[in-house]
Amino acid sequence: MLSFQDMILTLQRFWIKHGCALMQPYDMEVGAGTFHESTFLRAIGPEPWRAIFVQASRRPSDGRYGENPNRLQRYYQMQVVIKPSAPDLQALYLQSLYAIGIDPATQDIRFVEDNWESPTLGAWGLGWEVWLNGMEISQFTYFQQVGGIECKPVTGELTYGLERIAMYLQNVNSVYDLIWTTTPDGVLTYGDVHQQNEREQSFYNFEYADIADLCAQFDAAEKMSLLLAQKKFPLPAYEQALKASHLFNLLDARRAISVTERQRYILRVRALSKAAAEAWYETRAALDFPLCRQQGIEK
């Protein structure tokens, strides 16, 4: 039986073997792996890109004080990003499942059409959910637009729900019972690593995050992001947009914004993502799209 740690390592080795560069987690609070710069920014423009990474993702509203066996405010996604998209991406995905002990020939694996959209990122794509014996474990997306910019070429993105897959492999009903790894001191569980954090962060997300302070921080991040994008510094501009996005999610968890205000906040974050995306494209174009030049690819 694979531990949570060994499952991740096995998937990483699989995709490295198939030409992906191993990236490290983004050191920002993000709502999903798609927010990582290796996905969002690298999907823009003609330059090729092949990467795999694990990203801790935060959704404050999903916290349950560490008491729900399946709901987390912080969890892990593994993303594979291939641009231009590989024609055999689905077959490779099924092979990766086999590598961790899930045999597609004996399990009920279904691809259920589910086109993807992220309003705050100004992004959408054609996609499918992957269901294993009735449980969603992954998402395929072929990006059509990111930051309001059409994707040429199309980027293929594959997202693994690591906790769900591990719960199936280890046959446990609570995420906190997952075996993270075995050390010389004994078994280390997911709960040992993260349950206290789930409890404490839920108190912060739902009860103690200062609403006025969150609003002020959002305004400051928005202002700085727009300034940096205007100055053609897309990477720090994008990081400020990510800060604004997380602050919006905290305000949402605190129930501090109405339905109408919520839509306005989404549009404000979307404008930041779009400005950063446009600045990224322009700066890479000014550099003559260096990854295209290095690999002799026609722009």
Curated annotation (Swiss-Prot):
Family matches, as PANTHER family: GLYCINE--TRNA LIGASE, CHLOROPLASTIC_MITOCHONDRIAL 2, GLYCYL-TRNA SYNTHETASE
The name this protein goes by in its record: Glycine--tRNA ligase alpha subunit
Keyword flag Kinase: no
UniProt-listed Enzyme Commission number(s): 6.1.1.14
Phylogenetic placement of the source organism: Bacteria, Pseudomonadati, Pseudomonadota, Gammaproteobacteria, Cardiobacteriales
Cellular compartments per GO CC: cytosol
Organism name: Dichelobacter nodosus (strain VCS1703A)
Record field: catalytic activity: tRNA(Gly) + glycine + ATP = glycyl-tRNA(Gly) + AMP + diphosphate
Gene3D superfamilies with a match to the protein in the record: Bira Bifunctional Protein, Domain 2, Class II aaRS and biotin synthetases, domain 2
